[in-house]
């Protein structure tokens, strides 16, 4: 069976999708139902109204994450739109549940602007204990994350930035140890200067890396480039003869590929 058919069958059978919602309490008797819904449900409502922190006692808020996207940077596929990104968001939800027993709602937002996206997330945030931003294109992803962290009182995590950066840093630490090399002495070349690339490079710099060259589809990021934004301008090198990926790879110790294609 080829990969395409196997993947489509996996998502289609025995029922469409990868997620379902199940009750965590017994719902077999009339008494159970009267506690799960009216009239019994009024009691936790009143307790939460008196003290909002009680939501963590009487609801699933503390173990419920929203995996949220606008579908503008889906895997290596690019801007696929909100609806087409749903299988990826369901897949991330499965990982949360399988490896951490964290419950997830996947949410795909059609938003014309970053501010519209932000306001939508702010409006639904009371439901959740945390927000996982996923597959949002750079540079808008940086603005969205920054604004949500300012506006919300729950954790906001952008997986493509911070998740990727942590994994890359861990792998590189081990690889350098095997090679008996030091982070501050190696030359590191990134292909890709979007959300993942910038976040990885910034983390490695904070850990002591001194020689990092970023390359995107237009070549090496240097300070003569006129199209840099606030997130990658601090990663640009001084103008030099290094202009292409081939130039950058001369005597490189580490290559990290985080480009869209």
Predicted stretch roles:
Residues 22-27, 106, 110, 177, ...:
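Short, exposed beta-strand "edge-strand" segments with a Pro/Gly-rich flavor and a Y/T-containing core
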Residues 75, 82-100, 158, 162, ...:
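Glycine-rich phosphate/diphosphate-binding loop of Rossmann-like nucleotide-binding domains
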């Amino acid at each position: 069976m080829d990969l395409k058919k196997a993947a489509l069958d996996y998502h289609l059978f025995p029922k469409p999708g990868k997620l379902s919602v199940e009750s965590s309490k017994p719902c077999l008797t009339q008494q159970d139902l009267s506690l799960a819904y009216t009239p019994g449900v009024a009691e936790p409502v009143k307790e939460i109204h008196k003290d909002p922190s009680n939501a963590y006692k009487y609801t699933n808020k503390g173990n419920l994450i929203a995996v949220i996207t606008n579908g503008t940077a889906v895997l290596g596929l690019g801007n696929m739109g909100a609806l087409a990104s749903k299988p990826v968001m369901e897949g991330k939800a499965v990982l949360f549940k399988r490896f951490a027993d964290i419950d997830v709602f996947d949410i795909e937002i059609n938003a014309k602007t970053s501010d519209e996206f932000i306001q939508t997330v702010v409006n639904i945030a009371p439901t959740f204990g945390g927000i996982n931003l996923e597959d949002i294109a750079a540079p808008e992803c940086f603005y969205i994350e920054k604004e949500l962290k300012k506006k919300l009182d729950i954790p906001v995590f952008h997986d493509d930035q911070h998740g990727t950066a942590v994994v890359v840093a861990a792998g590189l630490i081990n690889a350098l140890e095997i090679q008996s090399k030091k982070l501050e002495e190696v030359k590191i070349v990134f292909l890709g200067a979007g959300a993942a690339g910038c976040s990885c490079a910034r983390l490695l710099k904070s850990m002591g890396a001194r020689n990092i060259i970023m390359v995107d589809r237009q070549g090496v990021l240097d300070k003569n480039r006129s199209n840099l934004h606030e997130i990658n301008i601090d990663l640009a090198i001084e103008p030099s003869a290094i202009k292409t990926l081939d130039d950058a790879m001369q005597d490189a110790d580490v290559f990290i590929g985080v480009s869209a294609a």
